[in-house]
């Protein structure tokens, strides 16, 4: 579907070969269920499972999503839309400031003053054979107004579904949702002025439709479940056994998820951009703000 660097309008096909797999790392756990993994649910649902890393429950599944997201990002760039992902919390280390532009560190962390603390944390986790979770964020700049449907395909609902599809994600918040319980209605409402919105607690989406402000969301990824710390589980015969998962596993899978989240958000936005163009091309979708 690509010729001389341009799409042809035909389906685009891609194959990503995994040439660095080490399936033997999983041979000692092929008959036991890893705690907090999909092993037990896949086995119950299908009566069979791929124990070599979890099959489609593995984050390897997301490699093709990121590839497709690269195409979506190119479409959004032509529209002036940018999608920016970052990590704001890892374990008990929280960013004091959020800078989602020009992040250039191996943790995708938004506060570079915390990098030495993160290095110490990761060294300790590796030595201990343990893991921690993370909070990630995505900010979409210059999103046009009007994307999303009012009921069954709300933009925030589709974004939530896309993010929750990512492995190990356990919750998502749109806008300032985590703090809304502490605010009164007079504080939480995003008042409208002639120059724009006075705040963005809604995260750029109202009634399932983008309102022209930045779209912001955050989500939490659980600690890596495959760890070297010994734990309890059952084997295929239903007997209680100890488990210790060897192999190459991250102390925090959250740092791997930034490009995945950017890709998923980009794919949802492109879908809605094209749908909105088809449905509302004859409507002048303007906000009543002063230029």
Which residues does each PLM region occupy?
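A short glycine/serine-rich beta->alpha loop
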Residues: 1-3, 49-61, 145-149, 202-206, ...
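Glycine-rich, N-terminal phosphate-binding loop and its surrounding beta-alpha-beta segment
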Residues: 1-41
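Short acidic, glycine/tyrosine-flanked loop/strand segments centered on an H-E-D-like triad
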Residues: 30-56, 231-251
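Glycine-rich, mobile lid/loop segments that gate access to catalytic sites or pores
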Residues: 45-151
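Alpha-helical support elements that line or immediately flank enzyme active sites
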Residues: 59-81, 153, 157-161, 213-221, ...
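Glycine-rich anion/phosphate-binding loop at the beta-strand->alpha-helix junction
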Residues: 129-240
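Internal helix-turn-beta structural module
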Residues: 226-291
């Amino acid at each position: 579907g690509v010729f001389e660097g341009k799409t042809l309008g035909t389906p685009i096909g891609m194959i990503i070969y995994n040439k660095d797999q080490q399936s033997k790392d999983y041979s000692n756990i092929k008959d036991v269920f890893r705690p907090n993994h999909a092993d037990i649910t896949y086995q119950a649902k299908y009566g069979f499972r791929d124990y070599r890393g979890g099959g489609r429950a593995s984050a390897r599944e997301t490699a093709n999503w990121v590839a497709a997201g690269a195409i979506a990002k190119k479409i959004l760039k032509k529209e002036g839309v940018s999608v920016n992902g970052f990590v704001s919390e890892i374990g008990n280390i929280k960013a004091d400031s959020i800078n989602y532009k020009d992040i250039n560190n191996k943790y995708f962390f938004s506060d570079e003053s915390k990098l030495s603390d993160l290095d110490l944390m990761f060294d300790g986790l590796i030595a201990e054979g343990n893991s921690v979770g993370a909070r990630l964020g995505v900010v979409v700049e210059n999103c046009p107004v009007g994307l999303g449907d009012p009921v069954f395909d709300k933009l925030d609902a589709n974004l939530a579904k896309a993010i929750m599809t990512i492995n190990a994600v356990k919750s998502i918040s749109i806008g300032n949702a985590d703090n809304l319980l502490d605010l009164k209605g007079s504080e939480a409402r995003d008042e409208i002025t002639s120059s724009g919105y006075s705040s963005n607690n809604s995260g750029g989406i109202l009634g399932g439709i983008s309102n022209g402000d930045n779209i912001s969301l955050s989500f939490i990824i659980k600690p890596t479940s495959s760890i070297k710390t010994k734990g309890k589980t059952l084997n295929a015969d239903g007997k209680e056994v100890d488990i210790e998962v060897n192999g190459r596993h991250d102390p925090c899978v959250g740092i791997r998820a930034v490009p995945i989240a950017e890709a998923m958000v980009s794919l949802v936005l492109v879908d809605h951009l094209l749908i909105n163009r088809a449905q509302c091309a004859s409507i002048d979708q303007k906000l009543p703000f002063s230029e």
